[in-house]
């Protein structure tokens, strides 16, 4: 998540339109009460959580998840939450953070939003 948010906020700071698409487990990063902290860190860090990686990043003086998300919010990065993912996880919209303006949509919405001259990155 850190690199996706860092890349999104950097691109938005350069006045490039950015859309972040959150689906399945990644949607939990947008739940209230820091749901991202409990997400698995990934295959390269077995047993670690997003919170563990965030502590490691901030311990090195790097921006943490909350700071990067705040930058994305400030730069008006568009956040698209997968409608199918919400249903699959049994999450209600009321469980998502109030400070993130998001739209619900799906893969078609995301692809339609991507400009012809833009780039789609999967991290």
Where are these regions (language model features)?
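A charged, amphipathic interaction segment
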Residues: 61-112, 118
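Short C-terminal domain-edge/linker segments immediately following a structured domain
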Residues: 18-25, 49-53, 110-115
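N-terminal beta-loop-helix "entrance" segment that forms/cooperates
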Residues: 26-39
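Long, hydrophobic N-terminal alpha-helical segment
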Residues: 1-26
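Short, glycine/acidic-enriched capping/hinge loops at junctions between secondary-structure elements
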Residues: 1-4, 30-33, 92
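Short, hinge-like loop/turn segments at secondary-structure boundaries
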Residues: 36-40, 97-100
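A glycine-rich helix N-cap at a beta->alpha junction
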Residues: 38-71
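Short hydrophobic/aromatic patches at helix-to-coil boundaries
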Residues: 120-123
